[in-house]
Amino acid sequence: MSATLDLARELIRRDSVTPRDEGCQALMIERLEAIGFKVEKMRHGDVDNFWARRGDAGPLFCFAGHTDVVPTGPLDKWDSPPFEPTVRNGLLYGRGAADMKASLAAFVTACERFVAEHPDHKGSLALLITSDEEGVAVDGTVKVVDALEARGETIDYCIVGEPTSEQRLGDTVKNGRRGSLSGRLVVHGIQGHIAYPQLAKNPIHLMAPALAELAATRWDEGNAFFPPTSWQVSNIQAGTGATNVIPGHCELLFNFRFSPESTAESLKERVYQILDKHGLGYELHWQLSGQPFITPPGALTDALSAAIAEVSGAKAELSTTGGTSDGRFIKRIARELVEFGPINATIHKLNECVEVADVEPLAAIYRRTLEGLLAKA
């Protein structure tokens, strides 16, 4: 029997579509309190969060993650019910299996085993858990971080249990993430009859040269840890649906994924310069979802990489690719932060799953990392 697999199945059984928790955190809290963790529940709005800590001394090691999952999609497209964990052909199926209930289970059993073997370990252990990561993420991890920051509590080492592995368990560790800056651009024209263009101003035509320049711009060159900043259009909307009407405005949604070689303000300024150069009448609204961050190789990456090599035999590659996570909030108070978890090939998909054979090794990697950083000599 596998204690980690059993707990993962219990977590998957709970229909915790964001922002609901549905009792996942209660399961974890019961196990953590039994090994000496002091738990603070921090509910905000419809979101359940908790901060659990064992010990008062430094250094502080934190596991961070989320109990919420994305919606299932069409139930009839699943081979088995998404909230009835099912093992088939060596795979554990269920919504959240990879993102990230296997990691949550592995956090708990890793702590249980580490504390049993090292009851007087150095420093402190903590878990920061939310049910608001897959949604709007305004009442979750960021609120807990605000509370910790307000009382001067900082984290030395943090592992966020996001599914980072690609081909085999342990092949990829995320030691940073790009920033995310989105924009909503509305270019104004004058609506009119398509047969009388001299009496109208077509905002699509007006925007096209600026759009071409934005798409061709090299924003920066990146650096040793990050690829160059990218700018991508996600949506363009204009027109009434009729073929004989020149639209009065055109709306464009776009996103920057940016390296630390650029700032949100520098990117905004360059966009304004391009739009103004083309003489557009426009409105532009911005949303900054996260700043870029990096954890250079150090004690945490060394301990985690050594644990991965010992348990799975993989050589971990440090990477900053991919989307944003709650690491963007935690890094404010964390000296060293990485993301590491199971294979991510099926996350957010129908028939989400993890390799059963990876579940206990994942817990072992987390435990070995703890030993590398907090076990007394």
From Swiss-Prot:
Cofactor(s) it depends on: Zn(2+); Co(2+)
Binding site for Zn(2+) 1: 66, 99, 162
The enzyme's E.C. designation: 3.5.1.18
Molecular function via GO: acetylornithine deacetylase activity; cobalt ion binding; succinyl-diaminopimelate desuccinylase activity; zinc ion binding
Residue positions of the active site: 68, 133 (proton acceptor)
InterPro entries referenced in this protein's UniProt entry, alphabetically: Bact_exopeptidase_dim_dom, DapE_proteobac, Peptidase_M20, Peptidase_M20_dimer, Peptidase_M20A
Known catalytic reactions: N-succinyl-(2S,6S)-2,6-diaminopimelate + H2O = (2S,6S)-2,6-diaminopimelate + succinate
The keyword Amino-acid biosynthesis belongs to this UniProt entry's keyword annotation: yes
Pfam family, one: M20_dimer
Cofactor: binding details: Binds 2 Zn(2+) or Co(2+) ions per subunit.
Spans traversing the lipid bilayer: none
Residues reported in the UniProt entry to bind Zn(2+) 2: 99, 134, 348
Pathway stated in the Swiss-Prot or TrEMBL entry: Amino-acid biosynthesis; L-lysine biosynthesis via DAP pathway; LL-2,6-diaminopimelate from (S)-tetrahydrodipicolinate (succinylase route): step 3/3
Enzyme superclass (EC): hydrolase
Keywords: Amino-acid biosynthesis, Cobalt, Diaminopimelate biosynthesis, Hydrolase, Lysine biosynthesis, Metal-binding, Zinc
GO biological process entries: diaminopimelate biosynthetic process; L-arginine biosynthetic process; lysine biosynthetic process via diaminopimelate
Assembly: Homodimer.
Function, as annotated: Catalyzes the hydrolysis of N-succinyl-L,L-diaminopimelic acid (SDAP), forming succinate and LL-2,6-diaminopimelate (DAP), an intermediate involved in the bacterial biosynthesis of lysine and meso-diaminopimelic acid, an essential component of bacterial cell walls.
NCBIfam families in the record: dapE_proteo, PRK13009.1
Protein family: Belongs to the peptidase M20A family. DapE subfamily.
Name this protein carries in UniProt: Succinyl-diaminopimelate desuccinylase
